[in-house]
């Protein structure tokens, strides 16, 4: 594995004069404003109340519980179908999957917020098979297969989106621990583009994230020279013609500006090669700096350049739900 990292990786550029290019702190201010959801699902104290799982709009989502003795009898009747005598206790499996501490998982179960194979479970004594049982908390799936890995990488500029580069240039593997080289990146960022890459060994999830039919949105911060004419926004939203067909952004928002430069946020679901750079070239405003800050519900937040973190249980659950898993 090549251990050489790109020069300047992770450093904060020197502050320039106002009116010059945006500095690292300007990008971090914009990225940091979007970091809230990336913190959900982190470690919790054992005495904290059971957490809510969240929709992307921030509203809590709870599983509806059946009412009355009839519903209770129906649930108990189904327990025999989902109970595995030789399996592991449900709260232990949930805790191992990173949902919460075992005690908090017991609270989630007793509140009727956990389903196993479509059956609401309220008794922590139920045993399940981690390999075959489908577990959901507040409707969000829980990943119980410990062999599968899901990582979030903040790619620095100058890093090649590949595991091994025959020319010896810095690659993704430069930043991974021993034994993680078997993971593959979902999509790619060109050499000069920074930001969020998902790394996994889950082939089905990767295929769905890349398939255009699922239209997974990607969010970018784009720096270009200013001033930017008002018509550029409408052009990009209406669509521009590229050599491989038309392309358009789903949304366009001006987030900051100086006398000489403009910082915008664009959202699009296309995964074509260098699509953002080519679209801005087409409207006469070449990209100076490009950072991907979000894929679906996964946020870059304040994650440091060159760092790799494990995707938390809630992020993974929402990401899978977005692509029908």
What are these regions (language model features)?
Residues 16, 69-325:
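Basic, flexible Lys/Arg- and Gly-enriched helix-loop patches that mediate nucleic-acid binding at interfaces
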């Amino acid at each position: 594995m090549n251990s050489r990292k790109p020069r300047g990786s992770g450093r904060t550029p020197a502050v320039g004069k106002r009116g010059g290019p945006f500095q690292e702190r300007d990008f971090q201010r914009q990225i940091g404003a979007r970091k809230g959801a990336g913190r959900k699902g982190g470690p919790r104290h054992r005495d904290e109340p059971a957490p809510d799982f969240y929709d992307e709009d921030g509203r809590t989502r709870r599983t509806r519980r059946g009412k009355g003795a009839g519903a209770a009898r129906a649930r108990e009747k189904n327990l025999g179908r989902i109970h595995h005598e030789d399996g592991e206790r449900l709260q232990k499996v949930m805790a191992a999957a990173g949902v919460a501490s075992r005690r908090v998982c017991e609270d989630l179960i007793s509140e009727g917020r956990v389903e196993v194979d479509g059956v609401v479970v309220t008794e922590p004594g139920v045993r399940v098979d981690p390999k075959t049982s489908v577990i959901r908390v507040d409707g969000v799936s829980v990943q119980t297969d410990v062999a599968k890995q899901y990582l979030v990488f903040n790619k620095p500029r100058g890093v090649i989106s590949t595991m091994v580069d025959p020319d010896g240039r810095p690659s993704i593997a430069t930043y991974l621990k021993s034994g993680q080289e078997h993971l593959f990146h979902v999509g790619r960022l060109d050499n000069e583009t920074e930001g969020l890459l998902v790394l996994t060994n889950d082939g089905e999830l990767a295929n769905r994230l890349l398939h255009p039919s699922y239209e997974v949105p990607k969010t970018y911060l784009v720096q270009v020279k200013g001033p930017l004419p008002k018509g550029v926004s409408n052009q990009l939203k209406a669509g521009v013609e590229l050599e491989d067909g038309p392309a358009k952004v789903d949304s366009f928002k001006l987030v900051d500006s100086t006398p000489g430069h403009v910082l915008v946020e664009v959202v699009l679901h296309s995964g074509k090669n260098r699509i953002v750079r080519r679209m801005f070239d087409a409207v006469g405003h070449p990209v100076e700096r490009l950072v991907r800050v979000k894929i679906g519900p996964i946020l870059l937040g304040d994650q440091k350049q060159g760092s790799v973190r494990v995707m938390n249980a809630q992020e993974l659950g929402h990401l899978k739900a977005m692509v029908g898993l």
